[in-house]
Amino acid sequence: MDPSKDTSPQVRLEKITYNYPYSDAAALSDVNLELKKGEFVLLAGPSGCGKSTLVRCLNRLVPEVSGGSFSGRVLLRGKDLTHEKVHSLALEVGMVFQNPETQLFSLTVAEDLAFGPENLGLPGEEIRIRVKKVLKEVGLKGLEDHFIFTLSGGEKQRTAIGGNLAMQPEILVLDEPTSDLDPAGTGEVLELLKHLNAENRTTLILIEHKLDAVFEMVDRMLVMDEGRVILDGKPFEILCREEEKLRKLGIHPPQFTEIARFLGFFSENSSIPAYETLLKRLTELLQASEVEIHPEDLEKRESEIPAPAPQPRNTPPHVLIEQLCYRHEDGSEAFEKLNLEIKRGEFLALLGHNGAGKTTLAGHLIGFYRPASGRILLDGKDISGYSTARLSKQVGYLFQNPDSQIFTNSVFEEVCFGLENLGMPEEKIKKLADSALEMMELSAYRNRHPHALSRGQRQRLAVASILALEPDLLILDEPTTGQDRGHIRKFLDKIRKLNGLGKTVILITHDMELAAEYAERVVVMKQGKIFLDGPTAEVFSSPEELGAAGLLPPLPARLALDLRKLGIDIPRLLTVSDLKSFLKARCPELSACRPTEIEKIVEENDSGEEVSLF
């Protein structure tokens, strides 16, 4: 695919400015942009910067559905879309939203994939061919007759993508399509997008916070802030040369580019190095150094989890699950004699492939599900007879979809709602609500309607509502969906402080980097069973077992494993900070070097002889 061969823009945006109803702040401000046919564009930026608003202009959802004040023009192949209707653009611009449930209409997977083509009046045989093709492309073959409500979040997301692909649009917009997918599922979807772009020349616009997964496969990167496009260029150039600006926006560079930059890659005319090249640079750097390293030489991990407060002897575990059995409504087995023990004050990451049973297991702790047999104890007390309302005083649960637990007319009212139901005095309610809003950086939006917030901001609002209730056990079910890295880390840093005060945290996530950085213990589920359970470093040192569960260790852990296979004496590493600290202690000269000078360190061994770098 060579987008440069097609010089005429497929899409042109001219001076687009837009305000949502009842909002004085512009969601988009004087945006000018051209896209060529066949481009694969990554659209990045902090939560609430206008990314989703911008792409919704392409099929007239903004302002046709959203209302508000709109000025400027959107042209598709030179045609002004000002007077076009949303439905008339469905064949030209497909859109996959952050929340797949907003665009799933049918009972089964196959019926939903057929929904669009049926509305086009296509012959039955053509519809069947399209559905069969899409089922294979999005990895849902075998699930065609499954009811939508029985699917995991990731399976629903792939169904939504498939429904768009069945329409065969020229432009496909994907608003965080991998947010609910495990690493294996993310890889499958991104490979699919890569194939569509390369083989069909489908123009792709991808909004994504998972930069590690996508930066190498896109042609172009756009960065937005406060309703404007502020950066536009090749991904690796922006990620390396504008790192300081990106960090200020809460956009952290991919682990790969951060490590490569630290090792001296990305000079003026360099390109993205391969993983093997990165590994070779590390090998030669470490072989050239014979400095003896002591544990005390390593800098303290920035991500180090505070040790839980010591527990008195004979204190029961905070959570004890014994012989838990549960079946779904369709009769399929979720768990069979599952056992799990969680100590008070632990920070536990619950990982696993889509459909492994993570959310179903966590839902038992708040009373959303009732086991067929077995029992669950909180602080030594059997909760089988407890209502969800009673459990909510002890257990705070954040859903994957924040809209499932937001229903008032203002941000402040939302945080106060649970407190009012507990009958607290008004003064205490206000104090707790203000504190929770400040913690989640939402004080400035206290009078705004929740649905005028971005998805990431609504996610933080749901968390604020939970934190105001001060539960002892926090269950965070994919809390990072729709948020930029800066907000994610600020949020999890605050959760970690609560954990340090003794609160137990269960983090359900597909983000291996965050699990490695924040959790002290990792539990991996596979097909309704506990597959791996242990300290984070130990679990992430088992790549084969993780791969069998559809997971992949974070990059520093993989590098450390491969270096040990090459005979390098290196400890288990989990984060980029771990790797940098180790390298600085092992190779003190790195601390004083600029990134582009580091390659000179490995050019000579002890005898002064040159060694081959690549």
From Swiss-Prot:
<dbReference type="InterPro" id="IPR003439">
    <property type="entry name" value="ABC_transporter-like_ATP-bd"/>
</dbReference>
<keyword id="KW-0547">Nucleotide-binding</keyword>
<dbReference type="InterPro" id="IPR015856">
    <property type="entry name" value="ABC_transpr_CbiO/EcfA_su"/>
</dbReference>
<dbReference type="Pfam" id="PF00005">
    <property type="entry name" value="ABC_tran"/>
</dbReference>
<keyword id="KW-0067">ATP-binding</keyword>
<keyword id="KW-0813">Transport</keyword>
<keyword id="KW-0677">Repeat</keyword>
<dbReference type="GO" id="GO:0016887">
    <property type="term" value="F:ATP hydrolysis activity"/>
</dbReference>
<feature type="domain" description="ABC transporter 2">
    <location>
        <begin position="319"/>
        <end position="552"/>
    </location>
</feature>
<comment type="similarity">
    <text>Belongs to the ABC transporter superfamily.</text>
</comment>
<feature type="domain" description="ABC transporter 1">
    <location>
        <begin position="11"/>
        <end position="251"/>
    </location>
</feature>
<keyword id="KW-1278">Translocase</keyword>
<dbReference type="InterPro" id="IPR027417">
    <property type="entry name" value="P-loop_NTPase"/>
</dbReference>
<keyword id="KW-1003">Cell membrane</keyword>
<dbReference type="InterPro" id="IPR050095">
    <property type="entry name" value="ECF_ABC_transporter_ATP-bd"/>
</dbReference>
<feature type="binding site">
    <location>
        <begin position="45"/>
        <end position="52"/>
    </location>
    <ligand>
        <name>ATP 1</name>
    </ligand>
</feature>
<dbReference type="GO" id="GO:0043190">
    <property type="term" value="C:ATP-binding cassette (ABC) transporter complex"/>
</dbReference>
<keyword id="KW-0472">Membrane</keyword>
<dbReference type="GO" id="GO:0005524">
    <property type="term" value="F:ATP binding"/>
</dbReference>
<feature type="binding site">
    <location>
        <begin position="352"/>
        <end position="359"/>
    </location>
    <ligand>
        <name>ATP 2</name>
    </ligand>
</feature>
<dbReference type="InterPro" id="IPR003593">
    <property type="entry name" value="AAA+_ATPase"/>
</dbReference>
<protein>
    <recommendedName>
        <fullName>Putative ABC transporter ATP-binding protein MA_1747</fullName>
        <ecNumber>7.-.-.-</ecNumber>
    </recommendedName>
</protein>
<dbReference type="GO" id="GO:0042626">
    <property type="term" value="F:ATPase-coupled transmembrane transporter activity"/>
</dbReference>
<comment type="function">
    <text>Probably part of an ABC transporter complex. Responsible for energy coupling to the transport system.</text>
</comment>
